[in-house]
Amino acid sequence: MGMRMMFTVFLLVVLATTVVSFMSGRASHGRNAAASDLIALTIKGCCSVPPCIANHPELCG
């Protein structure tokens, strides 16, 4: 294999890696948002229960 061919293969590998990384990052945004919503609901539930407020005052501000 010549230098041009090796460089072309290198560029293709870098491009493929970048595309896969970019697409997997976008796919996880929805899961992160759902997890944040669940955490917020859990904290709100804790703030309405006096024993939970006593154990975790930092959550309820």
Curated annotation (Swiss-Prot):
One Gene Ontology CC term in the entry: extracellular region
Name of the featured protein: Alpha-conotoxine-like Am1.3
Signal peptide coordinates: 1-21
Membrane-spanning ranges: none
Entry remark concerning the domains of this protein: The cysteine framework is I (CC-C-C). Alpha4/7 pattern.
Presence of keyword Secreted: yes
A GO term, aspect molecular function: toxin activity
InterPro entries: Conotoxin_a-typ
Propeptide intervals in chain numbering: 22-44
Classification of source organism: Eukaryota, Metazoa, Spiralia, Lophotrochozoa, Mollusca
Tissue distribution of the protein: Expressed by the venom duct.
Primary localisation category: secreted
Record PTM Cysteine amide, positions in chain: C60
Processing and modification events after translation: Is not hydroxylated.
Pfam families tied to this protein: Toxin_8 (PF07365)
Cellular compartment(s): Secreted
Keywords: Acetylcholine receptor inhibiting toxin, Amidation, Disulfide bond, Neurotoxin, Postsynaptic neurotoxin, Secreted, Signal, Toxin
Function: Alpha-conotoxins act on postsynaptic membranes, they bind to the nicotinic acetylcholine receptors (nAChR) and thus inhibit them.
Family: Belongs to the conotoxin A superfamily.
